[in-house]
Each structure stands twice: as structure tokens, then as C-alpha cells.
Amino acid sequence: MEKNTAASGQLMTSSAEATPSSPKRPAGRTKFQETRHLVFRGVRWRGCAGRWVCKVRVPGSRGDRFWIGTSDTAEETARTHDAAMLALCGASASLNFADSAWLLHVPRAPVVSGLRPPAARCATRCLQGHRRVPAPGRGSTATATATSGDAASTAPPSAPVLSAKQCEFIFLSSLDCWMLMSKLISSSRAKGSLCLRKNPISFCMVTNSYTALLLEYIILQMNSMIVLIHELSKYQVFLLLTMITHHLFQWRR
């Protein structure tokens, strides 16, 4: 009995020594969790080819996937996945990029059983059209000039911007500014100026006595100060004065 126990103990010891500490990894394909992208849907890494591959699952079927293609970058493969899903699911597709719906313009394609779906062809075609769009700074000079000319012709007219000489002004004294603002407040639609230099900046005054007092206080604090405003439009100057008035009103409350 003791001999059998000793023999079994030696057998277990020899088997434990023969077994490695870490089991060998089974040969074959790597798991999907280890090769898929951490952010993009339907994007996997193929290590042997060194490229990103795209496969999409057919809606309404269990386990059926269609091979779309391979790309060098994960972003390009994600665009391919979006194009294929738009062709398969339409507006209800789960996309990697929010702008793929209007940027790719993919038509809805029905899935044909047993054949490669038109979704793959639509995805490839739309991705090729998306690649043809020149990136900023990579196009030719003539194309960039023509594009800038078209943008300039279609752009809305911008507000006039005054030069540095036109925008330079000196604030008046407190008494003179109060007399000037009293004349402006007398009319509901009066327009005035706080400048003495050439080309003064005209802006609408708020018909409110308390606002006039606040403006008078601001000018009193900034008395005899030369202010240089470079390339500011009239609207920006008005917004600046309004912001100062608002902060001063909050401070006095």
C-alpha cells in the first residue's frame, strides 16, 4: 500500500514538472476582441497583411457578414464601413462619423442572397469619390485659386473694417461727454460719436438714463487715456462698450 502511494506521488510530481507554467496559445486566427479597433465599428487589424480590414454584418440575418475591403488607415476603413452600412440600413445605420450621411451620398441598396451585395460596390464607389476630394493644402495652385475665387464670389459681404488711423481716438473729459450724451439721449433714435479725430465711429446710443450714467462713469475712469483700436468694426466696438457696461452694472448691483 505504501509502495503504491509513493509511486502515485512520483507520477504526479513528474507530470507537474512536465507541464509548463503557462499553457501554449492555440495556433490559428487571433480572437476578434484582440484585433478589432477600440473606437471604430467594423474595423479590424490584419496582422499578416499589415492593413485594416472592414466587414459588415447583414441586418436581419444571423452571423452573415460581407467583406468590404482593406485600407491602410483605420479612419479610411471606418468611412468604408459607414458607406456600406448606409447602403444596407439607410438612415438607421450606426455610423463611425456623424458627417458620413451627407458627405458620402450613398444610395440605399437591397441585399441579394447568395451574391455579393450592392452595398459593397456602393461603399467602394463612394469611398473612391471621397478620396478624390483634395485635402486642404494638397491641391494644385490653380484649383486653390479657382476655389478661393468661387468662395469669394459666393461669400456674403463683410462689415467694413476701419484702419488703425481711422480707429484711433481720444476720450473726452467727463463733463464734455455728459453734455454730449445728454444731447444724444434727448432723441430716441439719435446717433452720436465719442471721437474727436478724423472719421469718427458712429453708433446707436441706448436711450436709458442709467446706462448713460454708467457710460459717464466709464469715461470718467478712463479720462485722458489714448486708446488705439486696430482693425475693429463698428459692431465690435459697440459690443465692447456693451460688455463693459454689463460688467459694471453687475458690479454695482
UniProtKB/Swiss-Prot annotation:
Main localization, broad class: nucleus
CDD domains, per the entry: AP2
Factors inducing expression: By cold stress.
InterPro entries the record matches: AP2/ERF_dom, AP2/ERF_dom_sf, DNA-bd_dom_sf, DRE1A-I
Pfam families membership: AP2
Coiled-coil annotated spans: none
Keywords: Activator, DNA-binding, Nucleus, Stress response, Transcription, Transcription regulation
One function term, GO molecular function aspect: DNA binding
Subcellular location: Nucleus
Location of the DNA-binding region in this protein: 39-98
Cysteines paired by S-S bonds: none
PROSITE patterns named in the record: AP2_ERF
Extent of Polar residues compositional bias: 1-22
Keyword ATP-binding assigned: no
An example Gene Ontology CC term for this record: nucleus
Record's compositionally biased regions (Low complexity): 134-153
Signal peptide: none
Residues covered by region (Disordered): 1-31, 131-153
Function comment: Transcriptional activator that binds specifically to the DNA sequence 5'-[AG]CCGAC-3'. Binding to the C-repeat/DRE element mediates high salinity- and dehydration-inducible transcription.
Family of this protein: Belongs to the AP2/ERF transcription factor family. ERF subfamily.
Name this polypeptide is given: Dehydration-responsive element-binding protein 1D
Protein species of origin: Oryza sativa subsp. japonica (Rice)
